[in-house]
Amino acid sequence: MKTPVELAVSGMQTLGLQHRCRGGYRVKARTSYVDETLFGSPAGTRPTPPDFDPPWVEKANRTRGVGKEASKALGAKGSCETTPSRGSTPTLTPRKKNKYRPISHTPSYCDESLFGSRSEGASFGAPRMAKGDAAKLRALLWTPPPTPRGSHSPRPREAPLRAIHPAGPSKTEPGPAADSQKLSMGGLHSSRPLKRGLSHSLTHLNVPSTGHPATSAPHTNGPQDLRPSTSGVTFRSPLVTSRARSVSISVPSTPRRGGATQKPKPPWK
């Protein structure tokens, strides 16, 4: 009689032997065609690989080969020897020519519009679109004309153009007025009679700009304004700048006094 410990040890040894025998027949060495192309020609000559079969043929061959492998496995159980089939070439290899390439395909609506002219004209669209939808899509590519024809409200479009002419001189007049103010403030450091004459001339220039922007200016400016002018800005701005240049040249020529000079009130106060 064997002790339970000895029985357990012998059972473990027999299980290990059975596991080794079962693992031996499952491992099979098949011919590989990778080393020939990647690592040079092999030591022994091997047959050329045949053409591959389609996937559905491979599945059928696999189901048939399962029974053959099972019968071979039963025969190999008794001997527990690994017999690699090196001479047999597998039939599950790809074919060189692909006979199952798809010929027909669904139509695409992107490549025709991006990479070429459409053969069916501009009205070509997807089948799921209605005629109204196609017309709406075409309207997105249309650019409106500069002036609407036959519109019910043309006034809002022309109103800004009409308002520009009267508002132009009034908006641009603060520029010469600001220049005159700067000149009058800058000339306060000079002598008193020069400042008074300059202030009177500046007020004389500013009065027609506020009262009558277009008609009173030719009377004050003299024969230089006999030529036609398109707007009030074009013939006033050069006169003011020329006057300002003459004043800026004449002001530094007068001797400046120290802090004893009293600043008179500007004409606008």
Swiss-Prot record:
Keywords: Cytoplasm, Cytoskeleton, Neurogenesis, Notch signaling pathway, Nucleus. Residues 80-92, 200-253 have a biased composition (Polar residues). A motif (Nuclear localization signal) lies at residues 92-108. Residues 128-156 are annotated as: Interaction with RBPJ/RBPSUH. One of its GO terms (cellular component) is nucleus. It comes from the Eukaryota. It is found in: Cytoplasm; Nucleus; Cytoplasm, Cytoskeleton, Microtubule organizing center, Centrosome. Residues 66-105, 141-269 are annotated as: Disordered. Residues 156-269 are annotated as: Interaction with tubulin. InterPro entries: RITA1. A motif (Nuclear export signal) lies at residues 5-17. Its main location: cytoplasm. GO terms for biological process: negative regulation of Notch signaling pathway; negative regulation of transcription by RNA polymerase II; neurogenesis; Notch signaling pathway; nuclear export. GO terms for molecular function: tubulin binding. Interacts with RBPJ/RBPSUH. Tubulin-binding protein that acts as a negative regulator of Notch signaling pathway. Shuttles between the cytoplasm and the nucleus and mediates the nuclear export of RBPJ/RBPSUH, thereby preventing the interaction between RBPJ/RBPSUH and NICD product of Notch proteins (Notch intracellular domain), leading to down-regulate Notch-mediated transcription. May play a role in neurogenesis. Belongs to the RITA family. This is RBPJ-interacting and tubulin-associated protein 1. It comes from Homo sapiens. The gene is RITA1.
